[in-house]
Regions:
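Conserved ABC transporter NBD signature motif
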Residues: 85-96
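Conserved ABC ATPase signature
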Residues: 170-174, 178
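ABC ATPase NBD coupling module
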Residues: 36-39, 94-110, 128, 136, ...
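Helix-to-loop junction immediately C-terminal to a conserved catalytic motif
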Residues: 77
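Short catalytic/signature loops enriched in Gly
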Residues: 3, 9-15, 29-37, 164-165, ...
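A short, proline-enriched helix->beta-strand linker immediately N-terminal to the Walker B motif
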Residues: 189-193
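P-loop NTP-binding/switch modules centered on Walker-like glycine-rich loops
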Residues: 200, 204, 208-286
């Protein structure tokens, strides 16, 4: 047994995992006032999110803290039940639940957590973590010799060599980057088709982030994995991802190829994200190309009507405050959920000037 995936006759653009109108609302604990008013409040963490993860490609889901992007990853990993919508694996709707059905699902879809310091049990060695994962997923082999070969193959795959130098180490004896590589190796032990990488480099030193992203890119190409890359860093999405989706307050507001989305953003929120990113070429006092908006994200217990970005948007129209914008197709396969791209809204925009 090796950690290589079996060859597949399907093309590299096949959809492996798909979310269709996925929604997740969390109930809020009722206070005395809620009981008296007979009301139930919910957090609208994710609303009507649709996305596709394709074999051999990286899809980035970008947004600021609290946008719901990590909740999307956990929904795709079947760690939370859906409020509405469906998840399809290989074209078939799935609802993993628990027990055997959940184990069968996670063999195909693995989640890499953000914190490499918390995702590994500090009292167990690297050997224990990887051996346990191989045995759970039936990939340990038929004997001790084959198990050792499989352990070595996993560590070599994540570029921790020589393997014997790492197998007997405890997590506290590893650097942050090495721990994250062990976490990736543990995910590969299942032989998955999909990796859900939830901010995999955000807690690592800047000097080693690029190495982990390059490792994930290598795995994508060698094993033809579909990868969802969750991040708040839109610059790294441009570097690492083939496709970028931008999420704000529980909804995806823009999508397209990463180069176009990051270099020519269509949605005002994407423009705000890019304008907020550090830019060494921006001279102090230099005027921005355009006003990009300011303020804080809205409460998801009582999200705004219409477009959820309208309280912060410098280009908001009256329609934005009352009607939720659909996706408008743009050139080159891109789209944006913004009334600015509805031709019927153009006259109204002129009137508000």
């Amino acid at each position: 047994m090796t950690t290589e995936q079996p060859k597949d006759v399907r093309t590299a653009t096949d959809v492996v995992l798909e979310a269709r109108s996925v929604t997740k609302h969390f109930p809020v604990r009722r206070t005395g006032k809620d009981l008296l008013a007979r009301r139930r409040r919910t957090v609208h963490a994710v609303d009507d999110v649709s996305l596709e993860l394709r074999r051999g490609t990286v899809t980035a889901l970008v947004g600021e803290s609290g946008s719901g992007k990590s909740t999307v990853a956990r929904l795709l990993a079947q760690l939370y039940p859906l409020t509405a919508g469906e998840i399809r694996l290989g074209g078939t709707a799935v609802k993993a639940g628990r027990g055997r059905s959940f184990r069968a699902y996670v063999r195909q879809v693995q989640l890499i957590f953000q914190d490499p310091f918390a995702s590994l049990n500090p009292v167990h060695t690297v050997r224990y973590h990887l051996t346990r994962a191989l045995r759970i997923h039936g990939r340990a082999g038929s004997g001790a010799t084959e198990l050792e070969a499989n352990l070595a193959a996993l560590l070599e795959r994540v570029q921790l060599t020589p393997p014997g130098q790492y197998l007997e180490k405890f997590p506290h004896e590893l650097s942050g980057g090495q721990r994250q590589r062990v976490a990736i190796a543990r995910a590969l032990a299942a032989g998955p088709q999909v990796l859900l990488a939830d901010e995999p480099v955000s807690m690592l030193d800047v000097s080693i982030r690029l190495g982990v992203l390059n490792l994930l890119r290598d795995l994508k190409e060698r094993l033809r994995l579909a990868i969802l890359y969750i991040t708040h860093d839109i610059a790294s999405a441009r570097y690492f991802a083939d496709t970028t989706l931008v999420m704000y307050a529980g909804r995806i507001v823009e999508g397209g190829d990463s180069e176009s989305v990051t270099q020519h953003p269509a949605h005002p929120y994407t423009q705000l994200l890019i304008a907020s990113a550090p830019d060494p070429g921006r001279i102090a006092g230099q005027e921005a190309r355009e006003e990009t908006g300011s303020g804080e994200p809205p409460s998801l217990i009582a999200p705004p009507r219409g477009c959820r970005f309208h309280p912060r948007c410098p280009q908001a129209m009256e329609r934005c405050r009352t009607e939720l914008p659909p996706r408008f197709d743009l050139a080159g396969g891109r789209w944006a959920a913004c009334w600015l791209y509805d031709t019927a809204a153009a006259p109204a925009k002129e009137e508000t000037k």
